[in-house]
């Protein structure tokens, strides 16, 4: 079974990370591609620009943001393709990398939970 975890993209890469995927639509400032040590950047699974701007990292909006983002993921072919790829390849560990400062209210949490439900 594939374990899906999240981690800040600025945190030190680890051999325990397994497959490292940057799940932000935009490349995080100050992070080089070499330092990120990515296996992929499926930016099409990130929240839409409109949803990201509406949320604006406001913890008070996180519950509704999560509901809206899950609805986007349910209708997103790229998200279903990613889940199918992970089911087929069966990596032991996948680490979703994000650039947000808030570790408790960010889209990677929602995506992690959605992927866990779809693997």
Regions found by a protein language model. Name each.
Residues 1-119:
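Residues lining hydrophobic/aromatic ligand-binding pockets adjacent to catalytic sites
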């Amino acid at each position: 079974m594939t374990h899906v975890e999240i981690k800040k993209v600025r945190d030190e890469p680890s051999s325990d990370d397994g497959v490292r995927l940057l799940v932000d639509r935009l490349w995080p400032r100050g992070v080089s591609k070499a330092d990120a040590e990515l296996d992929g950047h499926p930016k099409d699974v990130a929240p839409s620009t409109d949803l990201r701007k509406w949320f604006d990292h406001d913890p008070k909006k996180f519950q509704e943001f999560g509901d809206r983002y899950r609805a986007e993921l349910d209708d997103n072919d790229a998200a279903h393709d990613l889940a199918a790829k992970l089911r087929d390849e069966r990596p032991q560990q996948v680490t979703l990398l994000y650039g947000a400062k808030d570790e408790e209210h960010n889209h990677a949490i929602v995506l992690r939970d959605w992927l866990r439900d779809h693997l």
